[in-house]
Amino acid sequence: MNTYEELKARGLIAQVTDEERISDLINKGEAVFYIGFDPTADSLHVGHFMALCLMKRLQMAGNKPIALIGGGTAMIGDPSGKTDMRKMMTKETINHNVECFKKQMSKFIDFSDGKALLVNNADWLLDLNYIDVLREVGPHFSVNRMLTAECYKQRMERGLSFLEFNYMIMQSYDFYRLYKDYGCNLQFGGDDQWSNMLGGTELIRRKLGEDASAMTITLLLNSEGKKMGKTVSGAVWLDAEKTSPFEFYQYWRNVDDADVVKCLKMLTFLPLEEIEKMEQWQGRELNKAKEILAYELTKLVHGEEEAEKAQIASRNLFAGGGVTGDIPTTTYAKADLDEGKDILTLLVDTKLAASRGEARRLVQQGGVSVNGEKVAAIDKTFTTAEFNEEAALLIKKGKKSYHQIKAD
């Protein structure tokens, strides 16, 4: 099975401009491809995971990745799939986020000796002269055609600013510059970027008379059709300070049964033959498949040592083995805990619940226990007197979410 066939078998490919040409480039290791990342936060998250894994997979096959950081386009905001205008960011915030991205991407991509490139589109977009843009790029775009693009449809009903309308032109110009300056012949992106990607291939054809290609990556959706990578406390981040290795492990350990094999195929580097055997697994074996998924992805992001620690901590909890230092922890001043904290406050502070209203419902539905005992009253207060032998309160939400409380 060649590289392109494996991408298809793993369910990674959605749309392509020219399958034969793209397949040929990838299989021969001649693809110089780019994926864009808007630095709208100081960490990458699970939503970026598919792209990072694809870049790693293709680099291993001899192709050259370009990670394009949207330092310039982040100052505009991408309307694709959005119903509201994104808040504009300062240059300082963007630059900080770019540095954070570099560090995280290096875990997936080898940037040594020119094997991959990290490029910031601020390098060319911020110096563009408006008249030059109108003269060089403007003639190659039809407003009528742009307005029919999928990426603008949602915003048209509620209002699309001229600022955001320019996003397609900017992204198309990115591809043009990467093709011209770095020999980039292929762009990857999500389905919601398809119109912008086609704009780039068209601009290259019109200005340079040459062919470039585009391919969209399958979105990472669960069995209910919702994007994966969200919890009650927000996004699942790749930064250990934002989402601990244990929380990251638990997220994948707790995926629905229907999603396990799909995630193994799309995100891990295990051989397909090994994964296909797991498709027949049921019951306890399926839980083993979830452990494999969680371990492999945690190892990829946080390293083998952290993956092993997270796996041990998870198994201890499920076996009733008590608290370990790898479980997410919130620490209060001892004086505050001596006075007591009510269960609703604890649930919100630990982000096991998004609000006091949600916390109240969890308790009333019998979904919360502390140190193995179910909490029945919404006004139940806990102090250091209730600490267990590990000097902690172990809060459990539902069957799979844990958090410990300690005193400083």
Briefly describe each language-model feature range.
Residues 1-193, 198-201, 208-213, 328:
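NTP-dependent nucleotidyl-transfer catalytic core
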Residues 204-408:
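Conserved nucleotide- and phosphate/pyrophosphate-binding catalytic cores
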